[in-house]
């Protein structure tokens, strides 16, 4: 079975890679996720993925005394509405604020992926556009009370209850979840790593 290191605690990214047939070893890497003054959402999300990768790689080398044998993947996702980055809500009140901002409008979801393998590092940002239906205060309140928004960028989960708010998606469903499958596998292959299909050959 093909093996990957995932520099993340995200159960959603873990699920995506596992469903592709990879054996995944998690190497969580905590970093400062503050936005720099004047930083664009695109630059921010790419910097986050790259910093997570460097941090996870350093921790691996310090712990094991060697470089990883398998690709190390990190990613970061941000929701952008009217040019403003909506991260993970810090309170129920902020989750309500985010959902009111997204209600009845189009927003952008950016997911950056960074992969290190055999001394080479590649990063890419994938862009998605999502349209929310108009949300009532009752819908927002009930959703926030469910607890689902509290650890999600933009205060919603496309693969969960939050999916009922979405009228349309332009882009990648897996990218909105947190790890775009097409881009990730393409990057792995460009770096010389095996396709998930290679494990299925008789």
Swiss-Prot record:
The protein's matches in Gene3D superfamilies, at most eight in alphabetical order, are given as: 3.90.950.10
Keywords per UniProt: Cytoplasm, Hydrolase, Nucleotide metabolism
Q: GO CC terms for this protein?
A: cytoplasm
Show the GO MF annotations. dTTP diphosphatase activity; nucleoside triphosphate diphosphatase activity; UTP diphosphatase activity
- Cofactor(s) needed by this chain: a divalent metal cation
Active-site feature positions: 76 (proton acceptor)
EC number of the protein: 3.6.1.9
What catalytic activity is recorded? dTTP + H2O = dTMP + diphosphate + H(+); UTP + H2O = UMP + diphosphate + H(+)
Q: Where in the cell is it found?
A: Cytoplasm
Looking up Pfam families in the UniProt record yields: Maf
Site feature Important for substrate specificity, where: 12, 77, 159
Provide the primary localization.
Answer: cytoplasm
The alphabetized list of GO BP terms reads: nucleotide metabolic process
Q: Which HAMAP family match?
A: Maf
Q: What task does this protein carry out? A: Nucleoside triphosphate pyrophosphatase that hydrolyzes dTTP and UTP. May have a dual role in cell division arrest and in preventing the incorporation of modified nucleotides into cellular nucleic acids.
Q: Which NCBIfam families match?
A: maf, PRK14367.1
User: Which family does the similarity line name?
Assistant: Belongs to the Maf family. YhdE subfamily.
The entry's protein name is dTTP/UTP pyrophosphatase
């Amino acid at each position: 079975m093909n093996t990957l290191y995932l520099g993340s605690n995200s159960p959603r990214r873990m699920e995506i890679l596992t469903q592709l047939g990879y054996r995944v070893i998690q190497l969580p890497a905590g970093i400062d996720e503050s936005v720099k003054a004047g930083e664009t959402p695109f630059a921010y999300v790419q910097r986050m993925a790259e910093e997570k990768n460097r941090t996870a790689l350093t921790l691996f080398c310090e712990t094991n005394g060697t470089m990883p044998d398998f690709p190390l993947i990190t990613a970061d996702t941000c929701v952008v509405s009217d040019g403003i980055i909506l991260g993970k809500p810090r309170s129920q009140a902020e989750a309500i604020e985010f959902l009111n901002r997204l209600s009845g409008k189009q927003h952008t979801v950016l997911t950056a992926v960074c992969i290190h393998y055999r001394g080479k590092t590649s990063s890419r940002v994938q862009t998605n556009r999502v349209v929310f239906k108009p949300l009532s205060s009752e819908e927002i309140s009930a959703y926030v009370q469910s607890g689902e928004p509290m650890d999600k960028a933009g205060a919603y989960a496309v693969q969960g209850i939050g999916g009922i708010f979405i009228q349309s998606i332009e882009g990648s469903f897996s990218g909105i979840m947190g790890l775009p499958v097409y881009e990730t596998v393409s990057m792995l292959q460009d770096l010389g790593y095996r396709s998930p299909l290679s494990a299925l050959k008789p």
